Amino acid sequence: MGFQDPAEPFSVSDYVALAGKVIEDIHARGKNVLLVGGTGLYARSLLKAVPFTENSRDDEIRGNLEAEFAADGIEPLYARLKALDPEGAEGIHPNNTRRVIRALEYCMVTGEPFSKQAKDSKAVKSPYDGKMLVLSFRDRETLYGRINLRVEQMFADGLLKEAEDYFKRYGTPGQTSVQAIGYKELFPYFEGQYSLDEAKENIKRETRRYAKRQLTWFRREEDAVWLFADDFDAPADLISAAEDIARAHFED
């Protein structure tokens, strides 16, 4: 987005801090704020005021965990997380290396389970009065078809060149930005491990899997309002319904 070097780490706590400043600025100008995106962790952390312990990071511990992952894979680390924090491990996909390592780091540095953050957030009053709208499809095959079309559009819009430019400049570091679906599946293609068609199919598959996880995540949001695109005859009707909900919320 032009404000962060993609080779530098960028955490959810960084996002919450930056987003909070932008929201304050928009409110100061007498405007309403719309947050648009699909990452449940980031949305919840901002809107629900999830607390972040300042002293929960340790570069040496994180480095050791990353070295263990490089040597032995994710399975031993995930097993350790399940032993330290079964509840927290249940909410993290075992293939999400970054979050597994972060959760372990938190447990080891603070001596508390990573899942305690979410529980603590319930005792903290959020500074925002937000209304969450979730857009999906009732028919799963329709959703998957739209995901496949979206991936094709990403390539038409220049994803391949964007990822290749990054690869040539930085290689394949493990920062958050390049762990995003669409980047990480292309790096093996650049290294000659498989074809472009295989890379594209991997992106589609991983996006479908991610969509399933996000549906599960947002179903846990008790105050979320769901809008299903296949309930409407035309996109304009869907947009009108969303506008009505937003307008009613801002007028309250």
List the model feature ranges, each with a label:
Residues M1-D252:
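Phosphate/pyrophosphate-binding catalytic cores of soluble transferases and nucleic-acid-acting enzymes
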